[in-house]
Amino acid sequence: METTQTSTIASKDSRSAWRKTDTMWMLGLYGTAIGAGVLFLPINAGVGGMIPLIIMAILAFPMTFFAHRGLTRFVLSGKNPGEDITEVVEEHFGIGAGKLITLLYFFAIYPILLVYSVAITNTVESFMSHQLGMTPPPRAILSLILIVGMMTIVRFGEQMIVKAMSILVFPFVGVLMLLALYLIPQWNGAALETLSLDTASATGNGLWMTLWLAIPVMVFSFNHSPIISSFAVANREEYGDMAEQKCSKILAFAHIMMVLTEMIFVFICVLSLTPADLAAAKEHNISILSYLANHFNAPVIAWMAPIIAIIAITKSFLGHYLGAREGFNGMVIKSLRGKGKSIEINKLNRITALFMLVTTWIVATLNPSILGMIETLGGPIIAMILFLMPMYAIQKVPAMRKYSGHISNVFVVVMGLIAISAIFYSLFS
């Protein structure tokens, strides 16, 4: 008896210890969240002045952590290990709701994948012509080479995708922090002049309006919901009944890393420019690095901008691929199940990969203008799935009831409603 208890304690200790796979997932979560959007965040978050920026910096960690922890717990609440979000949704809410949410989940993530395929083609094309002085190959060939390159990583499976993303995080963070250090001598006091409530109210749209419209910017700057289901399933297989504690720990470290690196970069950029500069950059709809390169006449920044963007887009593409594949697979499986049929998962993954390759290549080649609007329409769906669905499940699903009664749940619902209302306002204003 004593030996059994000792071995059980030893087993729990070994599972609670930090592992190499935990680091890999931590960096994978970071890699999915921090995409090319980081290059626009200093403009979108800083244009309202320092007061809204400081408030957003305070809200960033709890908003990101509690929401993503809720979605992770939702996936972990499924009866059977190995169930992804599309299966858990059906288990908790029924077949009809399961099909609808799976469809919405796919169409919220898939357009982001298409946007990234266009973005990486545009970025590499521009880098070749402006920085390297080369004539880029025809767009159809260039986009095919780039997408096949990223899809090659996909062919090696989920572990390789997460490993590739975690490796790409290091050069990305390194270059971002070097750039931040490079900008410190350029600091001026203009941004600090907005460090009062009176000035903040007079800046841009006013303090409360600026904060309201900035919440969705923060949500999507730290959003990594497309990889959460894969993350939860993998950790449940590895840690069993300790998966929830382990997932929460990995999420916390990933979110601290996200908030610190991104907000340091944002504050340093904002302190290097005046509010008028940030407003001009927003009006021209260019990234912060493109604006800084022109503003300070710094060729080094002009070189760094596309390199940072290429790394950021690649790792975010891989993370979003996992979510899009899950949604597509879920739709196919549910459709076949309704007809009394099934399909082998490896075969389905190959079909999904081919579909993703062909469609992302066509869209990257054609570069349709409607794509941005489709991606924007997916915003409220992502916010609902990330913020509201897990909180609703806590009230309605017995397996989630143990997480009720916490003030953090109210916080997540409030932030979710603020984000969704601001997205709709931005869409229709």
Curated annotation (Swiss-Prot):
Q: Which residues lie on this side of the membrane: Periplasmic?
A: 44-46, 121-140, 185-201, 271-297, 369, 428-429
Q: Which residues lie on this side of the membrane: Cytoplasmic?
A: 1-22, 68-99, 162-163, 223-249, 319-347, 391-406
User: What is a single cellular component term in the Gene Ontology annotation?
Assistant: plasma membrane
| UniProt keyword Cell membrane present | yes
Per UniProt, subcellular location reads as: Cell inner membrane
Among the GO molecular function terms of this UniProt record, one is: symporter activity
Write out the transmembrane intervals: 23-43, 47-67, 100-120, 141-161, 164-184, 202-222, 250-270, 298-318, 348-368, 370-390, 407-427
The record ties this protein, via InterPro entries, to:
Amino_acid_transport_2, Hydroxy_aa_transpt
This enzyme catalyses: L-serine(in) + H(+)(in) = L-serine(out) + H(+)(out)
Keywords carried by this UniProt record: Amino-acid transport, Cell inner membrane, Cell membrane, Membrane, Symport, Transmembrane, Transmembrane helix, Transport
Q: How does it sit in the membrane?
A: Multi-pass membrane protein
The family note in this entry says: Belongs to the amino acid/polyamine transporter 2 family. SdaC/TdcC subfamily.
Q: What does this protein do?
A: Mediates the import of L-serine into the cell. Is energized by proton cotransport.
* Name of the protein in question: Serine transporter SdaC
Q: What is the lineage of its organism?
A: Bacteria, Pseudomonadati, Pseudomonadota, Gammaproteobacteria, Enterobacterales
Gene from which this protein is expressed: sdaC
